[in-house]
Regions:
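Short, charge-rich amphipathic interface segments used for partner binding and complex assembly
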Residues: 10-55
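Repeat-based scaffolding regions
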Residues: 4-7
Length: 55
């Protein structure tokens, strides 16, 4: 597997996880867990941006 396709696969998985977390975030809005989910989503956004910059 080439480096580029490996990075693309990691981006795809990160975006899928982000989408899952965003749907869970909607369910915990207004609860103490909301901040926890938002932090995870923010970290995934950073990871996705970093990976895309490597392409």
């Amino acid at each position: 597997m080439s480096d580029k396709s490996n990075v693309e696969e990691r981006i795809k998985k990160a975006k899928e996880l982000k989408q899952s977390l965003e749907s869970k975030l909607e369910k915990v809005k207004g609860t103490p867990r909301e901040e926890e989910f938002q932090l995870q989503i923010d970290k995934l956004n950073d990871l996705i941006a970093h990976l895309e910059s490597e392409l």
